[in-house]
Amino acid sequence: MKRLFVFAVALAGVSAAFWSGATEPAEADFVFREADYFHRWSQGNQHEFTPEGQEDLEKWTDMITVNAYPHVHDGDSLAAAANAVLENYRSSQAKVLRTDSVPRTSDRPAEHLIAAVFGRPELIEAAFARFQLIDGKGYSFVYSHRIYGKKSGDPMSAWLSANGPEVEKALMEWKFSPDSLP
């Protein structure tokens, strides 16, 4: 009888945890700028990650999007992918703030960076996109920061002044492992 009681109590505890939605905190997929990022969504070769507390993909502040480019295997095709994204940003009326390339060295392929701002009536978004070859495969890592509201231009300018160079540096130094992808 004692065994049955212990089983019933354990089952009740498991059942209560299940129905209340209680779960152990998930382990972060990676860390960027001292913030833990968690996988939120994937489709095809695109994967989106946000910090804890920013699970709502309709209203987030910080996001990292990882794009895999299966057809990109060398420096020329990586540059072509970066240029295609740059043209896409321009055709979307983004204000391109800066582009840069890190030249190839004997032990490291070239990399590319695009920093741009997208304005919409209800928000403004800054995007920093790094294009990199990892183990012979092309990726882009896009850190985006949003500010919501109709008058978000001045706050975004202030945010960019305070954070832009540091975000760019952190993104270009970031050691991402494709093993973090779902």
Language model segments and positions:
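Secretory pathway targeting signatures of secreted, lumenal, and periplasmic proteins
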Residues: 35-73
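Bacterial N-terminal signal peptides that target proteins for export
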Residues: 1-8
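Mid-chain, structured segments of secreted extracytoplasmic proteins
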Residues: 65-105
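Short, well-structured beta-strand
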Residues: 111-182
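Sec/Tat-exported extracytoplasmic proteins
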Residues: 41, 89-93, 171, 175-178
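Bacterial N-terminal signal peptides
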Residues: 8-16
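Ser/Thr-rich, low-complexity intrinsically disordered terminal regions
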Residues: 47-51, 107-117
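Short N-terminal segments immediately surrounding and downstream of signal-peptide cleavage
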Residues: 23-40
